[in-house]
Swiss-Prot record:
Required for efficient assembly and nuclear export of the 60S ribosomal subunit. Belongs to the LOC1 family. GO terms for biological process: intracellular mRNA localization; mRNA transport; ribosomal large subunit biogenesis. It comes from Aspergillus fumigatus (strain ATCC MYA-4609 / CBS 101355 / FGSC A1100 / Af293). This is 60S ribosomal subunit assembly/export protein loc1.
């Protein structure tokens, strides 16, 4: 078996063991002594200056609510009051005339919008009506041209077939009917 190392650290009973351990420990001590360390940086002084700078720049900031400043770019009517510390809402003063003037202004504005919408709708309806009439007129013109063309073709036929064409057309119709009878094929399904 392999020799067991003593479990107790520190001074050993055998002379050889103590000799071996001393040079190792002395060598490690020497290497630590010879290793040069950089000089320590002054971190503490910087930390003190940073904290002092932070303390200097840190000031209390007040909110708008604490200062009680009015909000900018807001138009508040005369009768509207916003009580502090309560729910947001509009509380009208008991001034009936002021309230009625505000209501009248709003209603007039809304009626103006409605009237303008109605006017636009009427104008659009008139435009649609005019377009529809134009389309009907074009359609009627096309029909008239078609009817005139049909009449002219009929008159040309009548002029050509004053006497000879009538007898030939009767004969041709009878021949075509007999041919159609002959050409018919019967199909039986099995």
């Amino acid at each position: 078996m392999a020799p067991n190392k003593p479990s107790v650290k520190g001074k050993s009973s055998s002379k050889g063991d103590s000799g071996k351990s001393k040079p190792l420990s002395s060598a490690s001590k020497v290497s630590k002594k010879h290793a040069k360390r950089p000089p320590p940086k002054e971190v503490k002084s910087k930390a003190r200056t940073e904290s002092s700078l932070l303390k200097k720049t840190k000031k209390r900031e007040y909110t708008e609510e604490e200062l009680g400043l009015p909000k900018l770019n807001m138009i508040t009517p005369v009768g509207v009051v916003k009580p502090k510390g309560k729910k947001k809402g509009k509380v009208f003063v008991d001034d009936q005339e002021g309230m009625m003037t505000i209501l009248a202004m709003v209603n007039a504005e809304q009626e103006g919008h409605i009237e303008s919408k109605l006017q636009k709708a009427r104008q659009l309806e008139e435009i649609r009506e005019a377009k529809r009439k134009e389309a009907e007129a074009r359609h009627a013109e096309k029909k008239n041209k078609l009817e005139e063309a049909k009449q002219s073709i009929r008159q040309k036929r009548k002029r050509k077939s004053s006497g000879n064409e009538d007898s030939k057309s009767d004969a041709s119709t009878s021949k075509s009917s007999s041919k159609s009878k002959e050409k018919r094929k019967s199909v039986s399904f099995a």
